[in-house]
Amino acid sequence: NNKVQHTCQPNCMKSSTIYYGIIPLGGSKMNDYIINFLKEIMAIDSPSGYTKEVIHHCQKEAENLGFHTHQTNKGNLEIYVEGQDDYTVGFCGHVDTLGLMVRSIKSDGTLAFTNVGGPIIPSLDGEYCRIHTRSGKCYTGTILSNYPAVHVYKDAKSAPRDCENMHVRIDEVVKNKEDVQALGIQNGDYIAYDP
């Protein structure tokens, strides 16, 4: 039975049962399903403009639940849910996250970056990240201040934590710009950081 059956009562999700495809969801099973699905999509890197993988994951899940889907030319995902009458309701959401982008490769092999969206840059100091190349390779790294240690830089405590005073150190043996370029990393590559 692939018919979508809605027996939800507003503000009363505990007593509801929703049948999507052949998967009955109600009470704690619904909560577990939602939490697990959210964990799955939050584990997929998806800075604004780099959402192809997370959209594909959502599309696959919706289709597994018996829904008809369509992807627009701009990469938006539409999911069609059959209702009990001809009243149409639309919902929208987003699956992109905040992130960074390689602005330039420095002569010492570190990456200068710019923000994608509006992340609070000072909170990213010491954060692990992943650099996604256009060829599909992914490299790990760490977002760091240009002045990381008080015993070396007397202004370390007061140095601004912003895009101009921070960089990404790649977890590869790189000594210069050419080493980084040999990995396939270039300006405009997306950088996603750990949630």
Question: Which positions does each model-derived feature cover?
Answer:
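N-terminal hydrophobic/helix-forming segments and targeting peptides
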Residues: Q5-P195
